[in-house]
Swiss-Prot record:
GO terms for molecular function: RNA binding. It comes from the Bacteria. Keywords: RNA-binding, Transcription, Transcription antitermination, Transcription regulation. InterPro entries: NusB-like_sf (IPR035926), NusB_fam (IPR011605), NusB_RsmB_TIM44 (IPR006027). Pfam families: NusB. Disulfide bonds: none annotated. GO terms for cellular component: cytosol. This is Transcription antitermination protein NusB. The gene is nusB. One of its GO terms (biological process) is transcription antitermination. Belongs to the NusB family. Involved in transcription antitermination. Required for transcription of ribosomal RNA (rRNA) genes. Binds specifically to the boxA antiterminator sequence of the ribosomal RNA (rrn) operons.
Length: 155
């Protein structure tokens, strides 16, 4: 068996990955450059952020998981878009950028991380949507992922 990772460390990794994916979608900067910014920059201005927010380069965050999610989404975004398209109630280009980032990350996680139960992926996506996306985005994200899960995880 591998080393056990705390759920909070994965949660923090998802949060940072979501922010990195969102940044990449908007800026189209090089993936390695964005990853480097997240790994080295002091992102938290004390006046704007709470001192208890997680930092990326600490034991509280699974950095390998962050890297997997971020680079996996960036490298496979077209494939991921194709996987989610049948479950969307509106065209892909009409999605909010945060919803798109969250759906891409969650679909990637369902397809590539068999070590994470799909219900955990969906629940984590809902919680991230409540924090980072528009008011009712969590309902939309839940609906898409709930419909997609059976085909992405054949169990």
């Amino acid at each position: 068996m591998g080393v056990s990772v705390k759920p909070a460390a994965r949660r923090n990794a998802r949060q940072f990955a979501l922010q990195a994916i969102y940044s990449w979608q908007l800026s189209k900067e090089n993936v390695a450059d964005i990853e480097e910014q997240f790994l080295t920059a002091e992102k938290y201005d004390e006046e704007e952020h709470h001192a208890n927010e997680p930092k990326l380069q600490t034991p509280e965050t699974d950095v390998a998981y962050f890297r997997d999610l971020f680079s996996g989404v960036a490298l496979n975004h077209m494939k991921l878009d194709g996987k989610m398209r049948p479950y969307l109630s509106r065209p892909l280009q009409d999605l909010d950028q945060m919803e798109l980032a969250l759906l891409r990350m969650s679909i990637y996680e369902m397809m590539n991380r068999d070590d994470v139960p799909y219900k955990v992926v969906i629940n984590e996506a809902i919680e991230l949507a409540k924090v980072f996306a528009a008011e009712d985005s969590h309902k939309f994200v839940n609906g898409v992922l709930d419909k997609a899960a059976p085909t992405l995880r054949k169990k």
